[in-house]
Amino acid sequence: VGDLIVKDAPGGVDIGRNVNSNEQLAACAVSVEGTYDPVTSLADLRHFDSLQVLSVNNRRGAPPITDLTGLEECKNLMLLSVPSVESSAFPTFAKLDSVVELKYGSDGIRADSNVSDLSALAQMKSLKMLWITGSEVDLTQLAGADLRVLRLDVTRIGSLEPLKQMENLSFLQLCQGPEIDSFAPLAESSVQYLSMSLSQGAQEAYKDMDYTPLTQMPQLIWLDLTNNITFDTETCKKLLANDTALKYLKISYTSAAKDAEELDTAHLKEFTAPAP
């Protein structure tokens, strides 16, 4: 579904949005956004039983959505994107049996998203791809979720230990250096694609962290450590020397990138390493 335009919004405002989704998600999609009063309830969507894609975007600072009741009647809904939701409305997520992809939280605005209890998300039967934007997230609340893709744009994660229970998790993205206790659980995870790239302003986010567990991920195929300034040459050599599936490596603007010529990258299909 692409180039979706929703017209005749309240107040005569035309609103447009590109919705990028799986090509198998055919026609029915709704995008709700604009400069009018914030959306607080989605109850009326119970009448849209053929709806497959729904994206709701409120203004920055808008109050959380208080009512998701009605979404469970959208039996064909596969892709859902919503900003912050009140804790009292979270149980409805557990009833959304058809949703495959969920994007939760105001994109890039961590403070605006309520992430106090995400346990209802683990009960979504078809959920495979989950994007979360918020402050501190407790991954133990997602225990039991059969995820393939997990993207976390959050302030703090704490322990990555629950990832070891996600046996089918293939892609993990940690956006802009969330606080993490240790990378150690990654060594026992099923992750094949790991994105930990940082912005220039967050280059030292993991300056006190041990990257060694990243060298102990036997299923790892693709790794992006762009701007992880303290990822050093010795650790990178260990990563490349280990018997892993690694084929794609991005270490741009890291300490290791300064010594790129010393690295044995012959087995890689793609290697990106501009020096700082």
Q: For each predicted feature, which ranges?
A:
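Concave beta-strand-loop units of leucine-rich repeat
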Residues: 4-13, 27-41, 50-70, 76-90, ...
